[in-house]
Amino acid sequence: MSGHSKWHNIQGRKNAQDAKRGKVFQKLSREIYMAAKSGGPDPSGNPTLRMVMDKARAANMPKTNIERAIKKAEGNSDEHYDEITYEGYAPGGVAVLVEALTDNKNRTASDVRVAFTRNGGSLGATGSVAYMFDRKGYLVIDRSTTDADEDQVLLDVMDAGGDDLETSDDAFEIYTDPKQFTAVRDALEKAGYKLANAELTMIPQNTTPVPADKKEQFAHLIDALEDNDDVSNVYTAAADDDE
């Protein structure tokens, strides 16, 4: 791995999203609905639904909200959302991937384009930056929840079929082939680990430092994208400040 650790960034983003909790729950409800609609309402037989439900619980989404979204998918609702990925560059030439669930592709494309252009970025064509990222399974064990040391965790991760382990003061971060994600997650939970995070994500092959004079503009762009109701995930190739 490139050493591009995600957990610190995820924690920071989660804290920032606490003030936008209603919007976060709305987006998660949409993801749960689509996962249940396409793969069935039983998470034991629908790994995508289980993953999104885990994500919702990690965001402290109420159980009633989760159940409501699943029941809606089981009903006669003809509501449909298209999965769209947008690609572009942030200020400083940093690659950005934007994943959206939308019921109006024209509206979302326009909103995403405006977010880029108003904040010093540029929206690119399909394929312009996607090749710079790899799809990976990503799991996190909070070190405060386990007595296992790094050697033991590494052994368990390898036995489970994981690809890589990164260690920090507060977490073990595990990366897997996306096809092995469910098997690795289940094996680690069976081994007694409590997962603080478990999701499929996009990891940059290389990172780009954000120039000091572009950092504020870069932050505004990411905020504008994440504030969009249709945007599910934003991935960047920005280097951490300590890289």
Swiss-Prot record:
Keywords: Cytoplasm, DNA-binding, Transcription, Transcription regulation
One GO CC term, this protein: cytosol
Primary location class: cytoplasm
Family membership: Belongs to the TACO1 family.
Segments for region (Disordered): 1-22
Gene Ontology MF annotations: DNA binding
GO terms for biological process, alphabetical: regulation of DNA-templated transcription
Membrane-spanning segments: none
Compartment annotation: Cytoplasm
Matching HAMAP family: Transcrip_reg_TACO1 (MF_00693)
Keyword Transcription regulation: yes
Listed name of the protein: Probable transcriptional regulatory protein LJ_0904
